[in-house]
């Protein structure tokens, strides 16, 4: 497929596994080295002078450590992006039809506040876990944001000229195993969904309605980290649930208003607890039943109010099985 693309592909930065590994390793070394130096200086000050001086040194260095930590984590994430597979490489090496992921560029930083995403050092985004759950169908690809230095993790990025993006989307829709959209209010995304409704077999179409974190959380590393922290994040997530539920419901109602006339059958009035909408062969929309994390995960995390938790692989199992059988 990659050898016969009818549009111009913008060359992406080549995948460099060794450089990416070194970059991530540098981030980890910086984290542990900085923490070790902090405590060594604290201990040396206590031994050489007094406990008070040691405490003052500890407090004085704390802002520098707190300020540098996000940069270390970003370095780890950058290394992972450098060694992430590129879409063209996957299309050349994997004979299966791809899964096309549609989303608004504004949702590229949409973090996943659920378990097990909270156990990761680098903040995990919805896209990464969604792509992981769909890779059994084929390579998951998406058009990349123009000008981004490295591709985001999740769907492998393909870059095209601004004048060609619609042709690229339609080309892959005609050859895809499935089309999955992270729904948001975006004119470009709505055009893509409209085209998908017209060109893609309805049973291959899947819509995901995420829980959007507040803008002030997405714009701050530490707020994102605390929201995803396995311990403290549990309480913050419960506090954030009403607002995130309201934003998710608003996305769905905007989608209903925009696409009611484009679908053969009416959409449900509300999502309820469902996160995904799929379609049957006749085009009838169906809410995928929400699944809870496994009992083992809930016991290990003491998480018994799993409102925001999306166990992607478990929840998407019916859709994946249906598409695989088509």
Regions found by a protein language model. Name each.
Residues 2-10, 69-157:
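N-terminal topogenic membrane-targeting module
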Residues 158-179:
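Donor nucleotide-activated moiety binding/catalytic core segment of transferases
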Residues 9-31:
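Juxtamembrane interface helix immediately N-terminal to a transmembrane segment
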Residues 109-122, 156-159, 217-225, 238-245:
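Short, flexible/disordered intra-domain loops and linkers
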Residues 105-106, 146-148, 185, 208-219:
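Short beta-alpha junction loops
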Residues 26-27, 33-64:
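Hydrophobic alpha-helical transmembrane segments
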Residues 185-214:
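Amphipathic helical hotspot of TIR/SEFIR-family domains
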Residues 222-326:
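C-terminal interaction surface of TIR/SEFIR-family domains
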């Amino acid at each position: 497929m990659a050898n016969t693309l009818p549009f111009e592909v913008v060359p992406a930065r080549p995948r460099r596994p060794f450089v990416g590994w070194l970059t991530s390793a540098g981030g980890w070394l910086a984290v542990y080295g900085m923490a070790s130096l902090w405590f060594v200086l604290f201990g040396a000050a206590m031994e050489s002078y007094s406990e008070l001086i040691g405490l003052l040194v500890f407090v004085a260095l704390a802002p520098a450590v707190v300020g540098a930590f996000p940069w270390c984590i970003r370095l780890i994430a950058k290394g992972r992006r450098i060694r992430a597979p590129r879409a063209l490489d996957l299309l050349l090496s994997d004979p299966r039809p791809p899964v096309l992921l549609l989303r608004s560029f504004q949702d590229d930083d949409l973090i996943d506040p659920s378990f097990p995403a909270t156990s990761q050092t680098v903040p995990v985004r919805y896209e990464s876990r969604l792509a992981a759950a769909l890779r059994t169908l084929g390579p998951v690809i998406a058009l990349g944001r123009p000008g981004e230095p490295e591709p985001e993790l999740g769907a492998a990025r393909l870059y095209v000229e601004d004048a060609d993006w619609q042709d690229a989307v339609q080309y892959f829709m005609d050859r895809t195993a499935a089309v999955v959209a992270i729904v948001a209010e975006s004119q470009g995304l709505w055009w893509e969904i409209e085209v998908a409704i017209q060109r893609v077999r309805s049973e291959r179409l899947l819509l995901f309605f995420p829980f959007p974190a507040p803008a002030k959380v997405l714009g701050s590393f530490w707020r994102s980290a605390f929201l995803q922290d396995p311990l403290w994040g549990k309480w913050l997530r419960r506090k954030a649930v009403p607002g995130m539920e309201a934003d998710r419901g608003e996305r769905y109602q905007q989608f209903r208003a925009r696409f009611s006339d484009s679908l053969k059958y009416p959409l449900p009035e509300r999502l309820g607890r469902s996160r995904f909408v799929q379609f049957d062969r006749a085009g009838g929309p169906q809410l995928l039943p929400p699944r809870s994390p496994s009992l083992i995960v809930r016991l290990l995390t003491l998480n018994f109010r799993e409102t925001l938790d999306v166990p992607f692989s478990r929840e998407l199992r019916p859709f994946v099985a249906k598409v695989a059988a088509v």
